[in-house]
């Protein structure tokens, strides 16, 4: 059986915390797509761990971890992240991580190109993390990329990397500050070190499913950053939703038991792109400060605003959530009134639009229709059960459930691992 944890907004919803809570029951924890642009922190046994490329199931000493075939794999970050986890006391991490031999390699070359492409775009820049994720997927789709298994054939590896570098050099000239021979030299060491981690992930996952293993899959980024369904072109370069999980891990869709959408009690976004409920006044600043809204991967401050239920309903239609995890509800503790977007409106006709349009110009022209709900004006972090919560907080939760049509089974009430209320467990298949 498999449980999926997927971001329902623009990322940074708090997926890692739920992964940490659920992974003690999992035998395998896997990532399907994305790269080391993703980032989240987990606090376990009083220690904070940062994850970017690695699955956060590594905090569970009894869990195997897999990086799936649709991930773009930055080799230096892989080893660096493993070392940092060891330094913080996690043991045996090298024996509990595997990497699909079908992953495409994310080179330092790709990061250099990423920065130049952002400069080319000027005012239309995407606001990428600068980690080379987009260029890595571009070379993958152009069929000029290098896969993990090709690292072990030195002749093929060096020829393909030199060809890739030559193509970019032709495009960018002296603006490209990159030495292909230096990167080739580094991979002579990586070639030896990587062998123990590389696996045929298709066979590995098939055997795990056939044996009935409990598999926990953590999505990277979120649905609104999906290359097909997000606010294109202000998106990442992979499929971040349900479809990307099935493709990236070759998982049997009939063996997926739970699809848990993680949704922050308000909304944040990093980088450029549409954000209809963004608040540039006092409320947005307050959310940013209380919520400590700056990125694990980049340190950039996140844009903040109210919860957008149009976005959540759209996300639900694509990912088919069976349950929701509402996170960071405690950040709203001191708000007298809480606004929630329930529709968009055409200012010319007054007609309400309840869907999320593909055309960003149309989206930009629409006004937001808000519903105002009363705040609870008291701390909730010490609440351990649903009915410990103030009635206003429960009303907020139930309004979201009714609007979206999906039960909220997990409620985050603080930063610690134990600050999570579990309810409606009948909606979750064990």
UniProtKB/Swiss-Prot annotation:
Principal subcellular localization: cytoplasm
GO molecular function, a single term: GMP binding
Family matches, as PROSITE patterns: ADENYLOSUCCIN_SYN_1 (PS01266), ADENYLOSUCCIN_SYN_2 (PS00513)
Gene3D superfamilies to which the protein is assigned, alphabetical: Adenylosuccinate Synthetase, subunit A, domain 1, Adenylosuccinate Synthetase, subunit A, domain 2, Adenylosuccinate Synthetase, subunit A, domain 3
Residues that hold Mg(2+) according to the record: 12, 39
Pathway linked to the protein: Purine metabolism; AMP biosynthesis via de novo pathway; AMP from IMP: step 1/2
InterPro entries: Adenylosuccin_syn_GTP-bd (IPR018220), Adenylosuccin_syn_Lys_AS (IPR033128), Adenylosuccinate_synth_dom1 (IPR042109), Adenylosuccinate_synth_dom2 (IPR042110), Adenylosuccinate_synth_dom3 (IPR042111), Adenylosuccinate_synthetase (IPR001114), P-loop_NTPase (IPR027417)
Gene Ontology biological process terms, A to Z: 'de novo' AMP biosynthetic process; cellular response to cadmium ion; IMP metabolic process
Record-level GO cellular component terms: cytoplasm
NCBIfam families in UniProt: PRK01117.1 (NF002223), purA (TIGR00184)
The protein's name in its UniProt record: Adenylosuccinate synthetase
């Amino acid at each position: 059986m498999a449980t999926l944890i997927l971001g329902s907004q623009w990322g940074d919803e708090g997926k890692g915390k739920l992964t940490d809570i659920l992974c003690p029951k999992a035998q395998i924890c896997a990532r399907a797509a994305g790269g080391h642009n993703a980032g989240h922190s987990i606090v376990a046994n009083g220690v904070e761990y940062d994850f970017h490329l690695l699955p956060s199931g590594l905090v569970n000493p009894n869990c195997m971890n897999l990086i799936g075939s649709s991930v773009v794999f930055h080799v230096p970050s892989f080893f660096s992240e493993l070392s940092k986890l060891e330094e913080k006391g996690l043991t045996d991490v090298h024996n509990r991580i595997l990497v699909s031999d079908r992953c495409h390699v994310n080179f330092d070359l790709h990061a250099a190109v990423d920065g130049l492409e952002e400069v080319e775009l000027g005012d239309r820049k995407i606001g990428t993390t600068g980690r080379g994720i987009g260029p890595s997927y571009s070379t993958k789709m152009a069929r000029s990329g290098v896969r993990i298994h090709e690292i072990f054939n030195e002749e093929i590896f060096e020829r393909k990397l030199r060809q890739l570098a030559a193509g970019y050099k032709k495009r960018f000239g002296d603006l490209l500050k990159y030495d292909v021979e230096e990167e080739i030299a580094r991979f002579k060491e990586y070639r030896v070190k990587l062998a123990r981690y590389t696996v045929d992930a298709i066979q590995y996952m098939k055997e795990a499913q056939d044996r009935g293993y409990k598999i926990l899959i953590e999505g990277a980024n979120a649905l609104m950053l999906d290359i097909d369904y997000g606010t294109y072109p202000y998106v990442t370069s992979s499929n971040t939703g349900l479809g990307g999980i099935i493709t990236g891990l070759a998982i049997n869709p009939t063996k997926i038991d739970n699809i848990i959408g993680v949704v922050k009690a308000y909304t944040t976004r990093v980088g450029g792109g549409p954000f209809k409920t963004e608040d540039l006044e006092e409320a947005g600043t307050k959310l940013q400060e209380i919520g400590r809204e700056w990125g694990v991967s980049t340190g950039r401050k996140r844009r903040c605003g109210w919860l957008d239920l149009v976005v959540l309903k759209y996300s639900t239609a694509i990912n088919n959530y069976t349950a929701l995890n509402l996170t960071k509800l405690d950040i709203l503790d001191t708000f007298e009134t809480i606004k929630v977007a329930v529709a968009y409106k055409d200012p010319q006709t007054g007609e309400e639009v309840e869907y999320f349009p593909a055309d960003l110009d149309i989206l930009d022209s629409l006004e937001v229709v808000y519903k105002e709900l009363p705040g609870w004006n008291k701390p909730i972090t010490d609440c351990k059960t649903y009915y410990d919560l103030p009635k206003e907080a429960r009303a907020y939760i139930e309004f979201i459930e009714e609007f979206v049509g999906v039960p909220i089974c997990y409620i985050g009430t603080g930063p610690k691992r134990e600050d999570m209320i579990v309810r409606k467990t009948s909606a979750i298949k064990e």
